[in-house]
């Protein structure tokens, strides 16, 4: 597909390096979700060190502010993922996202929330999760998201 970046949401400490290598060889940016890689999750800052040094990932995705902060110190591009469940979690995004380069919000099929959030934060927004058709993607982008993240291969080409 014509996407510029790939979010890696799976893998193990044994294969993540090869996954990143294949993505980068295709000319795409590789972002590893540090919280989801088996053998790295729950390892703290050392996991970020590993991703930066051993895999040469372009950036990380994490829900954990300490990992985002450490990744920034290492020069990685950071994507902080937030699950928006209610107005309290919405305000948490505004309050806690100051260190990330990009904010990834889930679910992504909420154009009104994306619009409101884009007016409250300075970072670009990515909409992820529960994007089921082209209408959801277009709605998220029209509301202010700069990109979407989806596992739906048919939407990659939409």
Predicted feature locations:
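Catalytic beta/alpha-barrel core
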Residues: 4-13, 31-40, 54-65, 78-88, ...
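Short beta-strand/loop segments at the ligand-binding rim of alpha/beta enzyme cores
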Residues: 25-35, 56, 73-83, 118-128
């Amino acid at each position: 597909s014509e996407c510029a970046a790939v979010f890696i949401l799976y893998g193990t400490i044994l294969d993540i390096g090869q996954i990143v290598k294949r993505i980068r060889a295709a000319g795409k940016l590789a972002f590893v979700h540090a919280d989801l890689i088996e053998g790295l999750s729950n390892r703290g800052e050392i996991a970020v060190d590993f991703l930066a040094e051993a895999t040469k990932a372009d950036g990380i995705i994490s829900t954990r502010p300490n990992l985002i902060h450490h990744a920034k110190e290492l020069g990685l591009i950071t994507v902080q993922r937030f699950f928006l469940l209610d107005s309290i979690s919405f305000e948490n995004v505004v309050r806690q996202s100051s260190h990330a380069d990009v904010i990834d919000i889930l679910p992504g099929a909420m154009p009104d929330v994306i619009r409101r959030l884009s007016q409250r934060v300075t970072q670009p927004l990515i909409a992820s999760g529960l994007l089921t058709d082209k209408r959801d993607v277009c709605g998220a982008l029209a509301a202010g998201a700069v990109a979407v993240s989806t596992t739906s291969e048919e939407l990659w080409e939409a």
